[in-house]
Amino acid sequence: ERIVAEIARFGVTRRVSPYLMNEPFLDKTILDKSRYIARHVPGCKVVITTNAGKLTREVVDDIVKDNPFRAIYISMQGIEKGPYESTMGGSLVFEETKRNVEYLMEQRNKHLPGLKIVMTMIKTSAIDAESAVRYWKSLGAESKYTVLENRGGNLPGFNELNVGSKRVFKDCTRLFKHAYIMFNGDMVLCCTDYYKTMVLGNVGETSIYDVWNSPRAVELRRNFIKGDLRDNPLCAKCVISGSS
């Protein structure tokens, strides 16, 4: 509640996504939390990204009753069972996920025409991203694919999955635009910092404003612009698909 109050007080936040390194719908209270944010920070967009594995009919029906989201992004690698399940991993089953997404779209079309649904995926050697994008667009969803990245060096299979050339992600804008806050209040430099190698501070001990504007955070951003990554191993290791 204190974090939401701070966001509301400054009035400059365009988007709040109440999750980071997890599947948000594993949290049984995610809709209540999202509604709280939407009520107390009415000027911002509440946006969620999900793999749709837990986006069941019951959850979708609950969203329809009182929708807090401006947009729902669904991460779904491809539109074929084998490549999808091998890429997504875990216990996700292609038919179940596809059924969940189609029910969401059906209910959106009936009851929530203003809710934006975007199907997203990463272009890799394992899936036919172009065909998947065409399929979802044919059903009325927005759809796109993005280029593969090694997530600050945290994706060991990058070279096998990469299509084409690769380069250092030196034009990234994440560290200038987004504050990534973990479950314990630690603000990390990037959404790819799974192991908390670049912790800027803790918003529970101070505030979002203080951590974002701390000398360490400011210096890291300035050095990134200069191309000096000596004290920033996360960005130094980050490689994306494509040429400079």
Q: Where are the predicted features?
A:
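Conserved glycine-rich "GG(E/T)P / GGGxP" loop and the immediately following alpha-helix
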Residues: 1-152
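Short, small/polar residue-rich loop motifs at catalytic or cofactor-binding pockets
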Residues: 173-175
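C-terminal accessory region of radical SAM enzymes
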Residues: 99-102, 106-116, 134-170, 186-187, ...
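Short, acidic, Ser/Thr-enriched surface-loop or helix-capping motifs
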Residues: 181-184
